[in-house]
Amino acid sequence: MFEKLQSDIHYAFNDAGLLATAMTHSSWANEQQEHVEHNERLEFLGDAVLELCVSEELFARFPGAREGDLTRMRARLVSKPALAELARDLQLELYLRLGRGEESQGGRERSSLLSDALEAMLGAVFLDGGYERARAVVRHVLAARWPCDADGKRSKDYKSRLQELTQSLFRERPVYALMGSSGPEHEKRFEVRLTLPDGTVFTAIGPSVKRAEQMAAGLALKNLESRSDG
């Protein structure tokens, strides 16, 4: 069930059970008759891994930046709202294992649960593959979010940035298509497919068409920027 997620983060787990644990909330574990490990310990580990990876990357990217500037940039990148947004871009809500009560109270959309799951996932990557693999995953999933300057400024308009990049690389624009919608009227989810000029396809599901398009554009940006890094 985690094939797409592993593809999105560019990492295939040797022990898929670690990823399953990373997506397991304590509410789900508490409902099981047998002992099941939840993601809080992995979250603790992933928080430290993320902070180190981001610190190392910022240190390398901005050799002239002062300590205060680096601290502010790191704080923006690893803040709970930023991590929740990143988790939504990866559609982690689709993989969470939640207890019935948490599910009924909208836990799948709760930012705190999503940011915790993202940190737990990074902790799982670290345990499964070591620091270098965890660092590669962090660099990949944050590819569209690294600051452009020491003030930490970076546009969040992924569609505009993607269009500029594809025009430069392919002299063509990406194509967006609405594939459908689901859910009740007050909680509709929209699926968008984005096709790059080279035929690479990305899909995203969001609470609005515009949001889904931005999410798909963010995934495409990460892909193109990781190609240039490689």
UniProtKB/Swiss-Prot annotation:
GO terms for biological process: mRNA processing; regulation of gene expression; rRNA processing; tRNA processing. It catalyses: Endonucleolytic cleavage to 5'-phosphomonoester. It is an enzyme of class 3 (hydrolase). GO terms for cellular component: cytoplasm. One of its GO terms (molecular function) is rRNA binding. PANTHER family: RIBONUCLEASE 3 (PTHR11207:SF0), RIBONUCLEASE III (PTHR11207). This is Ribonuclease 3. It comes from Nitratidesulfovibrio vulgaris (strain DSM 19637 / Miyazaki F).
